[in-house]
């Protein structure tokens, strides 16, 4: 069954976690529960994109520290912070650190689901763009030093002969390297290779 998105709930209060799990699951979201922020951060590298709903006051790593660490990692996950009644200063600090919004407990179910849908809608394009950029960077990293040199020559507009002369190797060998570059970069044409190089930051200067 297709869900409306995945939600990562972080709260040390078991009753609150269970309540949110029921609410969000009923609303059509996929849900993963964490009882503390450190457990979420430990799992983060392997998690698919989703929205984080976290309590602000928790033992150990609190919601503010979680935001600081997520910001330092440049995580694309949108974060909604839940605060207690009257915790406005903490909520403001959370917003300054990158939280997309905050909710004062107790809150209306519809308000939370609307906020989550909005947060996912706004953050998804950036998350997808970041994933694509990481994929392209991984392709570049898979190139051997010589393949990287050949790619740099190609995107600079040099012919096979000129690249061969530059590195004192035969044009035939350059053709082999060129084919390897196109395969590893998953490029079907030189123009596509140039676009990928731009995304990888190889044409910024």
Swiss-Prot record:
Subcellular location: Cytoplasm
All residue ranges annotated as the HTH luxR-type domain in the record: 136-201
Cofactors: Mg(2+)
Cofactor: how bound: Binds 1 Mg(2+) ion per subunit.
Residues involved in Mg(2+) binding: 11-12, 55, 57
Highest taxon listed in the record's lineage: Bacteria
PTM annotation: Phosphorylated by FixL.
Protein name in the entry: Transcriptional regulatory protein FixJ
Organism: Bradyrhizobium diazoefficiens (strain JCM 10833 / BCRC 13528 / IAM 13628 / NBRC 14792 / USDA 110)
Lineage of producing organism: Bacteria, Pseudomonadati, Pseudomonadota, Alphaproteobacteria, Hyphomicrobiales
């Amino acid at each position: 069954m297709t869900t409306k998105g995945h939600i990562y709930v972080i709260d040390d209060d078991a009753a609150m976690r269970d309540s949110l799990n029921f609410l969000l699951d009923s609303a059509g979201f996929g849900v993963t529960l964490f009882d503390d922020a450190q457990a979420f951060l430990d799992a983060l590298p392997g998690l698919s994109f989703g929205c984080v709903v976290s309590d602000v006051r928790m033992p150990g790593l609190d919601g503010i520290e979680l935001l600081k660490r997520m910001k330092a990692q440049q995580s694309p996950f949108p974060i909604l912070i839940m605060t207690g009644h009257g915790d406005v200063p903490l909520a403001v600090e959370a917003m300054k650190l990158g939280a997309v919004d905050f909710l004062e407990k107790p809150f209306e179910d519809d308000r939370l689901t609307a906020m989550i849908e909005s947060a996912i809608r706004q953050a998804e394009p950036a998350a997808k763009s970041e994933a694509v950029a990481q994929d392209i960077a991984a392709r570049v990293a898979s190139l051997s030093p010589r393949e990287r040199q050949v790619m740099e020559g190609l995107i600079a507009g040099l012919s096979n002969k000129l690249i061969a002369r530059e590195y004192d190797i035969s044009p035939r060998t350059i053709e082999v390297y060129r084919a390897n570059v196109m395969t590893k970069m998953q490029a079907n044409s030189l123009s596509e290779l140039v676009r990928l190089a731009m995304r990888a930051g190889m044409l910024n200067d």
